[in-house]
UniProtKB/Swiss-Prot annotation:
The record's account of how the chain is modified after translation: Activated by phosphorylation.
Superkingdom classification of source: Bacteria
Entry similarity comment: Belongs to the phosphohexose mutase family.
This protein's name: Phosphoglucosamine mutase
Species, as recorded: Salmonella arizonae (strain ATCC BAA-731 / CDC346-86 / RSK2980)
Keywords: Isomerase, Magnesium, Metal-binding, Phosphoprotein
Positions that bind Mg(2+): S102, D241, D243, D245
Catalytic activity, reaction form: alpha-D-glucosamine 1-phosphate = D-glucosamine 6-phosphate
Active-site residues, record numbering mapped to chain: S102
EC number, as in UniProt: 5.4.2.10
Cofactor note: Binds 1 Mg(2+) ion per subunit.
Any one Gene Ontology BP term: carbohydrate metabolic process
Cofactor: Mg(2+)
Pfam families per record: PGM_PMM_I, PGM_PMM_II, PGM_PMM_III, PGM_PMM_IV
Organism classification: Bacteria, Pseudomonadati, Pseudomonadota, Gammaproteobacteria, Enterobacterales
Length: 445
């Protein structure tokens, strides 16, 4: 990926009111995107958002910019990111735009684009939009200005799509499920999907007020969900993040089930049903227990760089259909084109129902290795700690001791002057000691 001024790996994101998340920038972004996308023929754009209060301001700015370029916008209202990808495909729109900062606090927001097929925009299109941003805004003739409209029952359309990914011969009758929607975009979607499939549903995190998205709820903070599952004696809990592209689950004992375990369950069930094509893709941070559990099943496993974009790229490279991050991004290309928390959760529920097993028991075939992460701050410009001979020597010694029953990963943060030291193995005390030993070597540089 070439150097970008605005676009990162997941669109454009920042604090509202600070560049680039300002009304004037977003208006120009809408215009620039409109100018580029208009070259492809269709002049229809789908715009969705999560529940942040700033979404109203930003969607108005986007719509004005698109209209000035001659493109019409159809609004979904609050809608999960994967729903916008789905609606973009079904409406044959030229692009879908999501206004969201995913799992971030309410004071952040962002803009990301989907192409006509529901995947992220190609690099060359993003680069063309950035080039257009350098030009002065012009307006098409009045007769060619874009219009704005609202999609009738966008939520209902997506609810039916989600239900369609659950096997027709199964139902959720008899299951008690707590669902936490993070006061985000799935608040009016996920509870209805589960209820219509037969589950008894207790919903939390379903009262968005514009400023409480992801606040002590959702996939990044499952404590409220764990407590409610235990209090209600529920069969399981499902936590989604603010824009619905992540899922973390909780079993009936209150234990957290992360993206690695979710992918293990889905991949194993796919193998049992004869529907698994190829292997599974994780990331550099995926637990070694996942890799070993899949190996025991004969399922190939590959690691991508951290980020759902890179997981998708690796899937496309391999021709495989399932990938995930331990943070809860689960990509099921047989079902969707992007990470979808509701759809991934439904596949786990299907495995529970089909096998008459609890979530706890479905996870029992995978032993999670203790994984210790230590962040070490370093002075930028003082040399690369990863190239230091002392650091290399300590790391090599730890790797030799762990052998094939553990793993060491050192990487730089992409946003701060930090070295992230990750060590995993079978013995937590040993792993912790090794992580701090390597961290001390990094600090000494």
């Amino acid at each position: 990926m070439s150097n970008r001024k605005y676009f990162g790996t997941d669109g454009i994101r920042g604090r509202v009111g600070d560049a680039p998340i300002t009304p004037d920038f977003v208006l120009k972004l809408g215009w620039a995107a409109g100018k580029v996308l208009a070259r492809h023929g269709s002049r229809k754009i789908i715009i969705g958002k999560d529940t942040r209060i700033s979404g109203y301001m930003l969607e108005s700015a986007l719509e004005a910019g698109l209209a000035a370029a001659g493109l019409s916008a159809s609004f979904t209202g609050p809608m999960p990111t994967p729903a916008v990808a789905y609606l973009t495909r079904t409406f044959r729109a030229e692009a879908g735009i999501v206004i969201s900062a995913s799992h971030n606090p309410f004071y952040d927001n962002g803009i990301k684009f989907f192409s006509i097929d529901g995947t992220k925009l190609p690099d060359d299109v993003e680069e063309a939009i950035e080039a257009e941003m350098e030009k002065e805004i012009t307006c098409v003739d009045s007769a060619e200005l874009g219009k704005a409209s609202r999609i009738v029952d966008a939520a209902g359309r997506y609810i039916e799509f989600c239900k369609g990914t659950f096997p027709n011969e199964l139902s959720l009758n008899g299951l008690k499920v707590v669902v936490d929607c993070a006061n985000g975009a799935t608040y009016h979607i996920a509870p209805n999907v589960l209820r219509e499939l037969g589950a008894s549903v207790i919903a939390i995190g379903c009262e968005p007020n514009g400023v409480n998205i992801n606040e002590e709820v959702g996939a990044t903070d499952v404590r409220a969900l764990q407590a409610r599952v235990l209090a209600e004696k529920a069969d399981l809990g499902i936590a989604l993040d603010g824009d619905g592209d992540r899922v973390i689950m909780v079993d009936h004992e209150g234990a957290k089930v992360d993206g690695d375990q979710i992918m293990y369950i889905i991949a194993r069930e796919g193998l049992r049903q004869g529907q698994l094509r190829g292997g599974a893709v994780g990331t550099l941070m995926s637990n070694m227990g996942l890799e070993l559990a899949l190996k025991q099943l004969g399922i190939p496993f590959a690691r991508a760089k951290v980020g759902d974009r890179y997981v998708l790229e690796k899937l496309q490279e391999k021709g495989w259909r399932i990938g995930a991050e331990n943070s809860g991004h689960v990509i099921l290309l047989d079902k969707t084109t992007t990470g979808d928390g509701i759809v991934a959760g439904l596949q786990v529920l299907a495995a529970m129902v089909r096998n008459h097993m609890s979530l706890h028991d479905l996870c029992s075939g995978m032993k999670m290795f203790p994984q210790i992460l230590v962040n070490v701050r370093y002075t930028a410009g003082s040399g690369d700690p990863l190239e230091n001979e002392a650091v290399k020597a300590v790391t090599a010694d730890v790797e030799a001791t762990l052998g094939n029953r553990g793993r060491v990963l050192l990487r730089k943060s992409g946003t701060e002057p930090l070295i992230r030291v990750m060590v995993e193995g079978e013995d937590e005390a040993q792993v912790r000691a090794f992580a701090h030993r390597i961290a001390d070597a990094v600090k000494a540089v």
